[in-house]
From Swiss-Prot:
SMART domains named among the record's database cross-references: RNA_pol_Rpb6
Keywords: DNA-directed RNA polymerase, Nucleotidyltransferase, Transcription, Transferase
Residues annotated as transmembrane: none
Any coiled-coil regions, as ranges: none
Catalyzed reactions: RNA(n) + a ribonucleoside 5'-triphosphate = RNA(n+1) + diphosphate
Class of the enzyme per the UniProt entry, highest EC level: transferase
Source species of the chain: Clostridioides difficile (strain 630) (Peptoclostridium difficile)
Protein name: DNA-directed RNA polymerase subunit omega
Length: 88
């Protein structure tokens, strides 16, 4: 059973979709080697650690502004263009 419970975590991020996105993105960062913001002495799985981080208020989310979305899209487009150029 996941501790903390989903209901406890939903008190911090009240939208299930945002919660899943936030936890999964943080879990991927933990898998990639980032240090946890909460104690992980028992070597729990990354999703459990990320869930505890959200429940403790160490991790949260925010929606991007329109300007930030445009910047991210432009950056992504530039990366794709560079990747295509390197493959040719």
């Amino acid at each position: 059973m996941l501790k903390p419970s989903i209901n406890e975590v939903l008190e911090k991020i009240d939208n299930r979709y945002y919660l899943v996105g936030t936890v999964s993105k943080r879990a991927r960062k933990l898998i990639d080697g980032e240090e946890p913001y909460v104690s992980n002495k028992t070597k729990e799985k990354p999703v459990c650690v990320a869930t505890k981080e959200v429940a403790s208020g160490k991790i949260t989310y925010r929606l991007l502004t329109e300007e930030e979305i445009e910047i991210e899209e432009a950056r992504h487009h530039a990366e794709q263009h560079q990747q295509i150029s390197e493959e040719e």
